[in-house]
Amino acid sequence: MIKKAITAMLIFCISLTAEAQKVYDIKKFGAKGDGKTNDAAAIQKAIDACSKTGGQVLIPAPFTFLAGPFNVKSNVDLHIEGGAKILASPDEKLYTESAFRENKGEGTIWIGGKNVENFSISGSGKIDGNGISFMGAEEEDAYILKPFNILDPRPHVFTIIGGKNIRIKDVHIGNSAYWTIHLVGCNDVVISGITLLNSLKVRNSDGIDLDHSKNVRISDCYIESGDDCICLKNRREFEEFGACENITVTNCTMTSSSCAIKIGSENMDAIRQVVFNNCIIKKSNRGVGIQNRDEGTVSDVIFSNMIIEGQLTTDTWWGKAEPIYVTAYSRASGNHKDANWRFPKGATEGKVGAISNIYFTNIQCFGENGVYVSGETKDKIKNIVFEDVNVSIDKTSNFPGGVYDRRPSKLDGFVKGSTSGFYFDTAESIKVQNCSVTWGKNKPDYFKYAVESKNVAILKVNNLDGEAAFPEKYEAVKK
């Protein structure tokens, strides 16, 4: 009798759950799934209906749904079954909404949403940005970008502006022509277990961009991108959303032709209270980059338990194989080639905020360059701490070394200098504690010191394990 009662109760609960979770199959709203027909209207109808009641919009397998732009809405779980795909239409004329409001020169929106709450993407299917369709000719290191007049039609894959309670889990997303996941002014976000694969030859193909967003948790993701894999920033077009803060990134593996983990360069507010932990960066042009170029500040950031592998590539991509890169320079101004009309003129032009309270601990660095820290003036770099950071440098490619990359800034983009384990230039306070520097077999003459310092007010080096690349010629620590 008791067993029957329990069974009846379970059946009742399951039926309630099934009733509560309404499913809206896009095929029932007219989607063809033949990979040729534009199914955006059918997908939009399903989303609109689901948003009114709450529930799931089903992208069923084994179909490919070609689609132009459409918008997601609140109270919807966009579920993409394994074997199903949403594919961006290659028709550039369909993409008319700028990704950055009045700034029309940096891409458009494919899958978008504004003021969206309680939205999720789930399932093991694919969202494919069809990025190569929007590219010009393929060269050895990158695709050429097609010329445009006013609106750059390259679509960002997924953009939410002003979102709350956003969940993106398990999906395969990528092949983007521009940024892949752009979250603007979002609060309470979880991105977990996704596979994000972009071409390593597509410029601007960022993985995840957190823009003025708060309380975001990213974990257990695999990301390959031509541009930054994960980037935190504060774009000027969305200044009403305030600081980017309270961000954690854990257990992710990344590869980038540019910078795997980036903070900046666009930053007109504050980026603070950020933790990156248990991450692996493989074969990237730059590993971790804090690249401040605007008046906003960066503070209270921890990088821990990481393996970083850097390698040189062509000048198309920002970076010179620095495993760790911390810089604060004013952005290029006027008609300088690195300036753009999207940046302000007047009171804030030419100003750069400080980087302070940054901690690097238990990090293994391998590659063709060392750690680089530099500020425009001493007060822009404060309290940078390296503890148990081990740097191993070897020349493994044919690309020229002995160069640091300061783009985009009003300074010369490339500056020649010695390659040292830790290279510090113009800062207020830096500490190196229990760190090591080792050199490989291939040592060009520009490989020099374990630690090199210029114009640093307070530098503390304690318990350093390592020597110069050529100890018979140079001391271990050069001040």
Positions of PLM-derived features:
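Bacterial Sec-dependent N-terminal signal peptides
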Residues: 1-23
